[in-house]
Amino acid sequence: MKQFYRSHFWIAAGLAVAAPVVCLAAKEFSMPKAQPAFSFPAHDHHSNENVTVAVDPYDTPAKEGIFVVKYREHELLPILLIITNDSDSPIELADMKAELVTSDRTKLTPDSEDDIVRRISHPNASGTRYPVPFPTKKAKGGVNSKQMDEIQSAQFRAKAVEPRSSQIGFLFFDVSDIPTPLTGARFYLTGVRNASGNELMYFEVPLDKYLNSQRPQ
């Protein structure tokens, strides 16, 4: 009887240890469900064109949980960009340019795919790194295939927004040496064009709107 209980104990212990590894191995990135831009605290609505732009920083451990890559450990700030077109005509994003301007007027542009891969492949020596408990397949420059899939699929890539619809995706900003990148910062979006090819007025989103919404009421 004692042998029976000992066997079951070790089986249970083995399953308890293996479960986190299996969960970690199975985790994959899934883009958040698209919500209208005006539903986010930090947004700018252009009533003339009926277009709204919003940003939602993923700056907390809870929100960062959707990712495979721990971007904050690599001093990268993911910001979800949401563009909602409530007009009757499509808008074009092919010439769109995004910029994050910090409180000290430092201008940041989104990192490219290669920039992100380079940062993750060659982390700063001072950063804390945790060993992965199982072998992984490398895809590009020290980034495994699951990480590479996420980097490619998470980024905002839409070239247009159809009428009565929204497009979303992440922009990744290098915030190394910037302790509080969001406080007093403003997000600018230019190069959005209407169906006639005319450029819309630039969008300006104060990030303090987001920060204020996170404070306890």
Task: Describe these PLM feature segments.
Residues 63-76, 86-91, 160-162:
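Short, solvent-exposed beta-strand/turn "edge" segments of beta-rich domains on protein surfaces
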Residues 72-80, 167-168:
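Short, solvent-exposed loop/turn segments enriched in Ser/Thr/Gly
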Residues 21-25:
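Sec/Tat signal peptide C-region and signal peptidase I cleavage site
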Residues 78-154:
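Mid-length scaffold segments of soluble, non-membrane domains
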Residues 26-34, 40-41, 97-104, 133-217:
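Surface-exposed edge beta-strand/loop patches
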Residues 10-20:
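Bacterial N-terminal signal peptides
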Residues 33-72:
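Low-complexity, acidic Ser/Thr/Pro/Gly-rich terminal tails and inter-domain linkers that flank the onset
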Residues 1-6:
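N-terminal secretory signal peptides that target proteins for export/translocation
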